[in-house]
Amino acid sequence: MAKAKFERTKPHVNIGTIGHVDHGKTTLTAAISKVLHDKYPDLNPFTPFDEIDKAPEEKQRGITINIAHVEYQTEKRHYAHVDAPGHADYIKNMITGAAQMDGAILVVAATDGPMAQTREHVLLARQVGVPYLLVALNKSDMVDDEEILELVEMEVRELLSSQGFDGDDAPVIRVSGLKALEGDPEWVKTVEELMDAVDESVPEPVRDMDKPFLMPIEDVFTITGRGTVVTGKVERGKLAINSEVEIVGIRPAQKTTVTGIEMFHKQMDEAWAGENCGLLLRGTKREDVERGQVVVKPGTNTPHTQFEAQVYILSKAEGGRDNPFYSNYRPQFYFRTTDVTGVITLPEGTQMVMPGDNTEMTVDLIQPIAMEEGLGFAIREGGRTIGSGKVTKILA
């Protein structure tokens, strides 16, 4: 039995299964878990189908989503795999997703070929910035005709290319999740091949720690005799004491130097991604900064007011609006730590948006906010969440 030793130094990669309902996403997820468990028992517990299928509910930015998280390891990597059973859950996770995927396995049943939701999922993956797709041609055990398999593969490749993915070179692996789950050696091998392809082809993500420093400001206060302190959770990067920073968003950008870093009342030399800390700012007055701005490495982030977004609007049952809205609707957009009013323009041909819909839109904010493509936000009305979205393109 091949034994891989557990190393914390392994790269961590977030992936997921996407594709049309009933094409076998959850069965394949369970099969991956089982095949890797059998291959590396020390590294992987087996997560059975029914555990993934009854995906637990979780809340992301006020929206309830049923989603299953499965962890497993290959020899090279540690994976966190998300599987959203329902089509609506999948869409909600893509748009609001805390689980940002570094790559996804597009599951297409060889018996059906690409269907409506296959197309919708690929389009959405492109819009929300999933960087890489590869294909599992599932249920291949049920198709005897090689020509049909080749046709389906061609169709899937064309679909990927049409949405800006690498349709020519993306790995397309013929698998049978069900047969692999039953332990059929021929089909177990195909799932091993699929995971080798995931290892080789899904690019390793840049870790949060290696990105330029960014901390959203949650609170501002004055320490007598020392100056102004801003607190928040470091979103990415790291910052050493005496570094120059820029404060961006809402008002004109200003530069200052961080003369002290404090965490849980202890002095620190550095602030790292994921940590809650206070930054002491040289020569900055209490009234110069406010919640909703961000502290960044100079020159790495600019404030914007106009952007395109992909948005999910809550249904009435989820606590959303009870009626549709139209262009020129002016709700609040909650970015990181603050609400800013924005004016919505719906795409041509869309008259109105109903609760429960997902849509594209253009937004004009009344104040500039530090943002980049892929940034998530909530849409709020009178303090309650009515929608959630991601910035897909910055316009101004």
Curated annotation (Swiss-Prot):
The lineage of its organism: Bacteria, Bacillati, Actinomycetota, Actinomycetes, Micrococcales. GTP binds at residues 19-26, 83-87, 138-141. The keyword Metal-binding applies. Residues 19-26 are annotated as: G1. It comes from Beutenbergia cavernae (strain ATCC BAA-8 / DSM 12333 / CCUG 43141 / JCM 11478 / NBRC 16432 / NCIMB 13614 / HKI 0122). Monomer. One of its GO terms (molecular function) is GTPase activity. InterPro entries: EF-Tu_GTP-bd (IPR041709), EF-Tu_GTPase (IPR050055), EFTu-like_2 (IPR004161), EFTU_2 (IPR033720), G_TR_CS (IPR031157), P-loop_NTPase (IPR027417), Small_GTP-bd (IPR005225), T_Tr_GTP-bd_dom (IPR000795). Keywords: Cytoplasm, Elongation factor, GTP-binding, Hydrolase, Magnesium, Metal-binding, Nucleotide-binding, Protein biosynthesis. Residues 176-178 are annotated as: G5. This is Elongation factor Tu. Its EC number is 3.6.5.3. Residues 83-86 are annotated as: G3. PANTHER family: ELONGATION FACTOR TU, MITOCHONDRIAL, ELONGATION FACTOR TU-RELATED. GTP hydrolase that promotes the GTP-dependent binding of aminoacyl-tRNA to the A-site of ribosomes during protein biosynthesis. It is an enzyme of class 3 (hydrolase). The keyword Membrane does not apply. Its main location: cytoplasm. Mg(2+) binds at residue 26. Coiled coil: none annotated. It is found in: Cytoplasm. Residues 62-66 are annotated as: G2. Signal peptide: none annotated. One of its GO terms (cellular component) is cytosol.
